[in-house]
């Protein structure tokens, strides 16, 4: 059994799609399929149920996944320890992020890591809203995640890295598009575009909190996992959305973003990781983040 077999298995298990897993690993799909077959042959168990439309983990695959992650993580720790003993930091660090909400933090962190840690490869994993990101941290599928705070989990360490005010994004032809400031109570009859409740996103929670401050419960016209797609839907007339000021600057041209009267709530951008002694490369990236972000 080879580490690369386990890495291939983990990629397919997380993507549930051979083509996507192959792209993630930077290899053709055919060798990846052969690698999985070798692993299944060595274990004497089928790890995936495959069809022309879907890939699913078998019971054996689900049981094997945490052990595979543990072996790969231990091997990474060992490699990094050997390199660290020679004064070199080498490794792969997987960073989760939600998308456009990280428009300023993720590019800056990535740039600084490239400058300061040239032998550390970053694997940037997008479209991870709060609840899924926490789950992936706990599973070891992510090393670090950028997310909204607070996070209520005793096993996860967090640090505040920035604060950002909210604004409202409206279609360009909205009746309030020409205002300087919007009182959210004037949007009580509008539909809101936001993230799904099951995602546990601070983006959604803040929408409800700000609307409650204005005295109403928002009517949700559409839910979508991607915060930037929410802005595109606003431009298409599906509804209005509450987002951060910086994200509003990136909104499509058929929308307007305006400050809101209710401003007691700010988005608390944070960085999160599992508590305890981590890998050398992961901890070095965390140190850089805490150095460059001063809330």
Swiss-Prot record:
Using the record, list the residue span of the signal peptide; answer none if the entry has no such feature.
none
**UniProt-listed InterPro entries:** LysR_subst-bd, Tscrpt_reg_HTH_LysR, WH-like_DNA-bd_sf, WH_DNA-bd_sf
Regions crossing the membrane? none
Say yes or no: keyword tRNA processing present.
no
This entry's Gene Ontology molecular function terms read:
DNA binding; DNA-binding transcription factor activity
Taking every annotated instance into account, which residue ranges of this chain make up the domain HTH lysR-type?
A: 1-58
SUPFAM superfamilies tied to this protein: Periplasmic binding protein-like II, Winged helix' DNA-binding domain
Q: What are the annotated GO cellular component locations?
A: protein-DNA complex
Keyword Glycoprotein recorded: no
Which key words tag this protein in UniProt? Activator, DNA-binding, Transcription, Transcription regulation
| One Pfam family per UniProt | HTH_1
Q: Which residues bind DNA?
A: 18-37
Its family remark reads: Belongs to the LysR transcriptional regulatory family.
What does it do?
Activates expression of the shikimate transporter ShiA in the presence of shikimate. Binds to the shiA promoter region.
Q: What is this protein called?
A: HTH-type transcriptional regulator ShiR
Species source reads: Corynebacterium glutamicum (strain R)
